Structures are given as C-alpha cells and as structure tokens.
Amino acid sequence: MGAESLIKSNDEDIGELNDIVGFHIRLAHGAVYRHFSETFADLDLTQKQVSVLWLVDDRPGIAQIELGRRLRMDRATTMTIVNRLQDRGFLRRERSATDGRKQALFLTPAGNKALDKAKHAIREHEDWLKDRFTPEEIDKLVEMLTRIHE
C-alpha cells in the first residue's frame, strides 16, 4: 500500500479501493454534481447550458463551432444545447457578419436574466466547494485537475 493511506473512509473500510485515485475522483465528482443539481434545481439548467450561456455572454457573436471547441463539446452536443436554449428564448442565432456559413450566438434579455440567476447559484455552489479548502489548496487542486483534463 506504500505510505499508509492518508484518506480513510469514515463510513466503512473500502479496502484497496482507497488507494485508487480514479475512485476518489469519481466520488468527488458525484458529490459536486449532486450539490450542483440541488443548487440549480429551480433554474432548470444543466452545467453545460450554463457554460454555454456564460461563454456567449463573455463573447457575444461567438460562432457556434468556436463555442463547442472552447467548451470541448462535439458538434452534435453543441447544436442540441444551443437549440434547447434558443427554444427557451435564451439565445438567438444570426449569420456571422464575417462568414455567412457560421452562426453567431447572442443572449436574449431572457438569457441574460437566466444567466444572472445561474451566476448567483454558481457563487453559492462555489462557496460550498471552496469552504473545504484553503486558497492555496484551491490553486493546487485546480492545477492538478487541469493536468488530468488537458
């Protein structure tokens, strides 16, 4: 087991699973996702939908293809999310002024309102998460997680 495992389950002995990094990442992901879902239940928005609204707000007129690339989503997923947000009146599409083949995305007033509510919920969710760590640990955690997903 190497250096005695520093992380012990309070509920029960999980044996060698305790030494599997991926197992702990899965447990952490589950806890974060559950809290996110509870925090966002009244907004009826998914994590990906909020990410799309936020990026479109940060970059008005962003091309749908560029949006998907930046959020690391395939074309089909991007189109499905954009379609749903447009159907709900949160986004509008326009032909790109620079390239008529591309769709430029913009938030509608309803999209701005939904994003404002989502940002409030995200602050609540982030506070819940960050309360478990020091500022230095947060920086290190983000750096380590980035190594995994990049």
Regions found by a protein language model. Give the residues of each.
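C-terminal regulatory/oligomerization modules of transcriptional regulators
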Residues: 1-17, 135-150
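Charged, amphipathic alpha-helical coiled-coil/dimerization segments
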Residues: 4, 33, 61, 83-143
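Short, structured helix-loop boundary elements
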Residues: 14, 18, 22, 46, ...
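N-terminal helix-turn-helix DNA-binding core of bacterial DNA-binding proteins
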Residues: 14-19, 26, 30-77
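Surface-exposed charged/polar residues within alpha-helices that form helix-capping/stabilizing sites
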Residues: 23, 38, 54-55, 113, ...
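DNA-binding alpha-helical recognition surfaces that contact promoter or target DNA
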Residues: 80
